[in-house]
């Protein structure tokens, strides 16, 4: 419920400890609430209830003999393997080794993209005129084999139009880069294909991971087909005609790069996602689930920021792919100055940017879009605009993170810092590559930087969508029920997580209900034990880390008397386990006269139901 519905006094004693960073375990008379249960948390049979004049509680010492007016409780937000509950997989959780394999494969994809860029820069891509998936792995080893390969190259349009002066030794240099590119591609295919087949056939991969692996192996095969389709465009008979310039189609080059980027994204996203899920699982086992769910909830509320980051990832992708058009058209070889394109001009003339010579229709209706993808001058200008926009957007994210540094999780702030640094370095590399007229080392670094930038953006985006990882962890695991009571010994008390609360000194005006004026609330424990408390008819809490992860199951008779849940409450309930049709957040229920005698069941997974007299 909103603060506006709470009394001023309630706001005072609740929000003050929140500002001081305390963990508010419960609120006694003014409202009731129950922390969210995680499937499999153990249920302790010991219940500690004792008299208190204070609404804020300290550590519990189990005492079954004392309870009176006020009831407090705290779910264990940990799914740690304790004697009372053991985490068990219901679906095979991908191991970290799988994540490292996928990320290692993505590094190989990055390497082949760089090698492909060098192949394009050295004009080596058409040096091998045949497609031999098996025998092509072995390069020519003797002079006779080299001469045979060179004779095949002599029949290509590129040799006849551009390299008729080339010798066998010069041919060996360009042959190496194309051969290395193809062999590396085959190696990547085997690196992804063989482990994928093994894991799927032996059922070592979960259904979720199996689908990903099938998609990734399909992309590998598709990439090989696209690569040869691209090379064939540079061997076309039409390129023998006068005025032609033998080179691969820049459309197919962009498609080839796009397929590689899609494979790279799939590998990085899946590998990083597995590591993220393991990090969440570790948090749940260590008892930090409340912090984890609080983080997920707070991140989900940053809808505008998440949309901005998603748009930023799209912008990085478009900028990257526009670079393929720049490379395919050799557009980086013109206007090698920055920021000007020509003397004293930020852009060439309109007639140059929209040249009618690039039109293919008689009525010139394709003037604009044809120039956008075929005109080197306009293509370079587009890449500049996209790159500058990406840089400005990254700076905007950085400024936002500084302004919101108190509410953004640390890892997200770190990711934004990395994105800003990488984008700045990439922009600098791009300008240097242009000014120095596309030297191969700088251009290769610039191409590698594009994928590094994409990686940083993807990592940030994935951190801003943690709900998917958390949902998977919950669906993949369950908690074994509590062991027999005999197994609960004194040792369990030392293993239970202790919960601390802050005891403010300014709530003394809040008094116990006068006889006959209190509103009775009956809590039914998982063991069927009924506990009655009385509370005043006054405001409930605004909410905290504790109450944002809680729910109880209201008796149907009284459920109809409650106000309908608001959107925020429904969002929180979506994160909880063990929900039933009448589940509600306790912190959102105001005690009223018509609710006198209300009965609520505590979720079966609850443990550590306790109340402790505060220390003086």
UniProtKB/Swiss-Prot annotation:
GO terms for molecular function: 2 iron, 2 sulfur cluster binding; iron-sulfur cluster binding; metal ion binding; NADPH-hemoprotein reductase activity; oxidoreductase activity, acting on NAD(P)H; oxidoreductase activity, acting on NAD(P)H, heme protein as acceptor. The keyword Nucleotidyltransferase does not apply. Keywords: 2Fe-2S, Electron transport, Heme biosynthesis, Iron, Iron-sulfur, Membrane, Metal-binding, Mitochondrion, Mitochondrion inner membrane, Oxidoreductase, Transit peptide, Transmembrane, Transmembrane helix, Transport. Its EC number is 1.17.99.9. It comes from Schizosaccharomyces pombe (strain 972 / ATCC 24843) (Fission yeast). The etp1 preprotein is cleaved into 2 chains after imort into mitochondria. The N-terminal chain containing a heme A synthase cox15-like domain etp1(cd) is a subunit of the membrane-embedded cytochrome c oxidase complex and functions in the respiratory chain. The C-terminal chain containing a ferredoxin yah1-like domain etp1(fd) is released and serves in the matrix as electron transfer protein. Pfam families: COX15-CtaA, Fer2. Disulfide bonds: none annotated. Pathway: Porphyrin-containing compound metabolism; heme A biosynthesis; heme A from heme O: step 1/1. Residues 119-182, 234-254, 333-380, 439 are mitochondrial intermembrane. Heme b binds at residues 383, 446. This is Heme A synthase-mitochondrial ferredoxin fusion protein. Heme o binds at residues 181, 256. GO terms for biological process: [2Fe-2S] cluster assembly; heme A biosynthetic process; P450-containing electron transport chain. Residues 45-465 are annotated as: Heme a synthase cox15-like. Residues 502-606 form the 2Fe-2S ferredoxin-type domain. One of its GO terms (cellular component) is mitochondrion. [2Fe-2S] cluster binds at residues 541, 547, 550, 587. CDD domains: fer2. Gene3D superfamilies: 3.10.20.30. In the N-terminal section; belongs to the COX15/CtaA family. Type 2 subfamily. Residues 1-45 form a transit peptide. Residues 516-616 are annotated as: Mitochondrial ferredoxin yah1-like. The chain crosses the membrane at residues 98-118, 183-203, 213-233, 255-275, 312-332, 381-401, 418-438, 440-460.
């Amino acid at each position: 419920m909103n603060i506006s519905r709470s009394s001023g006094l309630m706001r005072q004693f609740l929000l003050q400890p929140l500002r001081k960073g305390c963990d508010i375990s419960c609120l006694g008379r003014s409202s009731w609430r129950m922390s969210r249960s995680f499937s499999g948390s153990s249920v302790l049979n010991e219940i500690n209830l004792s008299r208190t004049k204070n609404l804020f509680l300290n550590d519990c010492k189990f005492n079954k003999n004392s309870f009176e007016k006020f009831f407090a409780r705290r779910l264990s937000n940990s799914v740690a393997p304790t004697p009372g509950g053991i985490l068990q997989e219901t679906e095979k959780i991908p191991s970290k080794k799988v994540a490292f394999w996928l990320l290692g494969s993505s590094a190989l994809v990055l390497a082949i993209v760089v090698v492909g860029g060098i192949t394009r820069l050295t004009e080596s891509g058409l040096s091998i005129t045949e497609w031999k998936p098996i025998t092509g792995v072995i390069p020519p080893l003797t002079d006779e084999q080299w001469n045979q390969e060179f004779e095949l190259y002599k029949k290509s349009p590129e040799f006849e139009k551009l390299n008729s002066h080339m010798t066998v030794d010069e041919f060996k240099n360009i042959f190496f880069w194309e051969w290395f590119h193809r062999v590396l591609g085959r190696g990547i295919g085997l690196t992804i294909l063989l482990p994928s087949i093994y894991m799927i056939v032996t059922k070592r991969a979960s259904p979720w991971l199996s689908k990903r692996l099938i998609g990734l192996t399909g992309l590998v095969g598709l990439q090989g087909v696209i690569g040869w389709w691209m090379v064939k465009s540079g061997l076309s008979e039409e390129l023998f005609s006068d005025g032609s310039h033998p080179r691969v189609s820049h459309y197919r080059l962009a498609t080839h790069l796009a397929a590689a980027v899609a494979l790279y994204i799939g590998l990085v996203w899946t590998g990083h996602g597995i590591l993220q899920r393991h990090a969440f699982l570790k948090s749940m086992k260590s008892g930090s689930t409340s912090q984890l769910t609080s983080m997920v909830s707070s991140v989900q509320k940053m809808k505008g920021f998440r949309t901005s980051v998603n748009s930023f990832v799209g912008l990085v992708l478009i900028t990257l792919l526009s670079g393929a058009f720049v490379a395919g058209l050799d557009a980086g070889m013109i206007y090698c100055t920055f920021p000007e394109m020509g003397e004293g001009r930020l852009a060439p003339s309109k007639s140059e940017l929209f040249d009618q010579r690039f039109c293919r229709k008689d009525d010139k209706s394709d003037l604009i879009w044809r120039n956008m993808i075929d005109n080197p001058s306009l293509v370079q200008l587009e890449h500049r605009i996209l790159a500058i926009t990406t840089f400005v957007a990254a700076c905007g994210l950085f400024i936002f993170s500084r302004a919101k540094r108190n509410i953004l999780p640390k890892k997200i702030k770190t990711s934004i810092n990395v994105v800003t640094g990488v984008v700045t370095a990439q922009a600098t590399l791009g300008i240097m590559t242009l000014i120095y007229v596309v030297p191969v080392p700088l251009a290769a670094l610039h191409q590698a930087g594009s994928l590094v930038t994409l990686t940083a953006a993807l990592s940030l985006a994935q951190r801003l969508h943690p709900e998917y990882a958390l949902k998977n962890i919950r669906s993949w695991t369950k908690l074994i029920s509590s062991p027999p009571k005999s197994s609960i010994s004194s040792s369990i008390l030392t293993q239970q997580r202790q919960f601390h609360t802050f005891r403010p000194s300014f709530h003394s005006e809040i008094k116990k209900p006068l006889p006959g004026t209190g509103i009775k609330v009956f809590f039914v424990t998982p063991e069927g034990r009924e506990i009655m408390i009385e509370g005043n008819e006054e405001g409930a809490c605004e909410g905290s880390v504790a109450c944002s992860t809680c729910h109880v199951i209201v008796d149907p008779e009284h459920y109809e008397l409650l106000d309908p849940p608001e959107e925020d409450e429904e969002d929180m309930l979506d994160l909880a386990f063990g929900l039933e049709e009448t589940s509600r957040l306790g912190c959102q229920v105001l005690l009223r006269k018509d609710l006198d005698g209300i009965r609520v069941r505590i979720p079966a997974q609850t443990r550590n139901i306790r109340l402790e007299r505060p220390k003086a």
